[in-house]
């Protein structure tokens, strides 16, 4: 596992002292390695890892099994940001008095995406941010075809990717082709007709399971390219420099909005296109 040394050390210390919590929440961005860390924790505890879903039915089955199973078990509730209120309420019951042989680990991208009462009963572990050096180390270990002499390609990864999981995602999309497309959008979004501008969304995945470029990475690339234009122009009196800066700042607002897991991505994309075009009008 790349990085997370301090967090791993802290968890191991708690396990050795016999004070590791029966219920904890791992918080971190997508692809940060939360599930991988949970797998590692189960090994340190000499426990069986039992992944479960987030539906009310899944939680009820998990609770029932937790009282029946013998031996140490780690029940892993992954990607629980969108868990229903009913499922969260069911989870409350078992986290209040966990069975002696059961540990419960929930993973979230944002700790606010669950009930206050659940947070109050859990020990929260926050994944450390990955440094560019660690992202580069991961790239060079996992993708041998991205060699050190391809500096431009590696810089795309280290600029856009916050986690190893995002490196995998960007690689699956084709980093260079993706970045070239984003640059094309930056240069032409205000020049094409309104109807053609909305075709930008055809290349972006706006629903789970839909093919296309990842929306978060697309917006991050757009911001990066806009700021590169600002640096290249480097003339405060140049009107375009200010417009590129406005596009970057406006897009960053949409990136923050995207953190809301219930956001309508299609609506967000349409609104973003209109606001970016308005900047140039």
Where are the predicted features?
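Sensor-1/coupling segment of RecA-like P-loop NTPase cores
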Residues: 83, 97-115
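Short hydrophobic/aromatic-rich motifs at helix boundaries and adjacent loops
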Residues: 63-64, 83, 107-108, 241-245
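Clamp-loader machinery-focused feature within the broader ASCE/P-loop NTPase space
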Residues: 1-99
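Charged, glycine-rich active-site and insertion segments that engage polyanionic ligands
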Residues: 1-33, 37-46, 110-221, 225, ...
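AAA+/SF3 P-loop NTPase mechanochemical coupling elements
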Residues: 91, 100-102, 118-121
